[in-house]
A protein has these predicted regions:
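Long, glycine/tryptophan/cysteine-rich extracytoplasmic
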Residues: 9-50, 97, 117-118, 123
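Juxtamembrane non-transmembrane "cap" segments at the membrane-aqueous interface
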Residues: 27, 92-114
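Membrane-interface helix-boundary motifs at transmembrane edges
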Residues: 69-77, 154-155
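Individual transmembrane alpha-helix segments
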Residues: 38-64, 128-135
Length: 168
């Protein structure tokens, strides 16, 4: 659970700080309606409009998990372990993972474009691989910091409880 939250926070952080070229910046700004989309085919525009919905869903999920993690700070190790194990595996065979995710999230098939299309030339697969690696590394760092802080508090609480029992 916490690792998923760390992944989402890392995603938004990398999204803000990633070194984009001008065309990529324009595309990201268009997703957030801060700029008009560049000339694209109807299929590319339909794909980008769906991507907008996924960005909104990711933002809602991030906020929801932040609130939930704040109210329920106990770890969910089974979810965390699954995410920690699956994340590097997805990076090992990124092309296949990328294709599978697109088949799941875009079942109507509007994610396959010619190699010379605007989207493919602006944000090629290598861009998403670098973005994903940066997101994963930052998520691991955030999770490590959270774990250290959480366990420091837990150990302190445990030792305090233990010493009060022993002093009785």
């Amino acid at each position: 659970m916490i690792f998923v939250l760390c992944l989402l926070i890392a995603f938004w952080t990398v999204l803000l700080l990633f070194p984009y070229n001008t065309a990529q910046q324009d595309l990201i700004l268009a997703i957030f309606h801060l700029r008009e989309y560049a000339p694209m085919t109807a299929a590319e525009l339909a794909h980008m409009h769906e991507v907008e919905y996924y960005f909104v869903a990711a933002l809602i999920l991030t906020i929801t998990l932040c609130v939930y993690a704040y109210k329920q700070p106990k770890p969910y190790w089974h979810v965390t372990l699954l995410c920690v194990l699956l994340s590097p595996l997805t990076l090992i065979n990124f092309h296949q993972t990328w294709d599978m995710l697109h088949k799941i999230f875009f079942p109507q098939g509007n994610y396959i474009f010619p190699y010379d299309s605007y989207l493919i030339t602006t944000v090629p697969l290598e861009f998403f691989l670098q973005f994903s690696v940066a997101t994963f590394i930052l998520a691991v760092i955030l999770y490590t910091v959270w774990t250290c802080v959480y366990y420091r508090q837990w150990v302190s609480s445990f030792l305090s409880s233990l010493s009060s029992r022993l002093s009785k």
